[in-house]
């Protein structure tokens, strides 16, 4: 249970597509992730996670919106506190992709749900998103069943000659 909450909570804050410091915001929803637990002593767990996500409130950059998004991370949980870092890949509706690195923390509640927060930054893009840069924050929740959502906000810049978000 703890591993699913950590995975879901922290994976949600990632995959964003991000001129000159243009603001962006959206809402990302992730299904229950697949988890491979590497072991632990009962007080701490270390896990590899992968989740499929959808932008329920997408943003647009140069007319393209994010579609299929996959998050992969490594996390650890000690008691009710967790942390994770990973990467999120979004395939835009034009076929190009963006890649985000994220990290964050999670606090599990007694009912098995959790709150999460963290930061993200673009590491690269393909096609018209080549040279993308930017960063921001995420904050969200995970349900006891492992599904999760996060509000994502921040800013981005496209490489010289690229158009801004709509």
Language-model segments: which ranges?
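Positively charged n-region of N-terminal signal peptides that target proteins for export
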Residues: 1-4
